[in-house]
Amino acid sequence: MKTLILSSSLADNSRSFLLCKAVEEQLLARNNNITLVDARNTPMLPVHKELTTEMRTLSKQVKQADNIIIGMGVHCYSVNDSLKILLDTCFSAAAGKFYGILCAAGGERSYLSTMHLTQICMNEWRMMQLPRIVFATAKDFKEDVISSTELLERIKLFSEEFHVIGNKLLT
């Protein structure tokens, strides 16, 4: 199973990147073929401009992936601008793919913010979402480490379900 994990936050201390790395580790342990893309290393331009080399590479990776996991931070109860640019410019080949969401937010009241990403993926490309979302807040981290055992268990369960369902959808 070829899984693309997109960490979309541009923050130097991105907590959603930590979630992506934790899921990557879990899926690698299950012998999945993982490509992790860190948006911090992807120069981007808006949809009306020519794509950068890195954006063209991401478009190819989306096309080649069997499924996709998207890591996002919350900004004003929605997806961040970098994720929106990457969705608008690089996801045309995502139609019908299975996907999952990892979300890091500053506070507990942002838990519905992932619904905007769900609407985009389901309405634009008819993607199929894993019904489990990993949602974390600042209290789940100590500096740059996931400190919550509950969050680690949710990551493990998300990864197990993503692996099992993703493989079933391939057969």
Write out the residue ranges for each language-model feature.
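A short acidic, often aromatic-flanked loop/helix-cap motif at beta-alpha or helix-coil junctions
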Residues: 42-45, 137-143
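N-terminal beta1-alpha1-beta2 submodule of the flavodoxin-like/Rossmannoid cofactor-binding fold
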Residues: 1-90, 147-171
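A glycine- and small-aliphatic-rich helix-loop capping segment at beta-alpha/alpha-beta transitions
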Residues: 85-92, 119-124
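His-Asp phosphorelay/catalytic-motif detector in bacterial-type signaling
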Residues: 95-96
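Short, glycine-/small-residue-rich phosphate/pyrophosphate-handling segment
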Residues: 99-138, 150-153
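Juxtamembrane helix-loop transition sites at the ends of transmembrane segments
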Residues: 87, 119, 140, 144-147
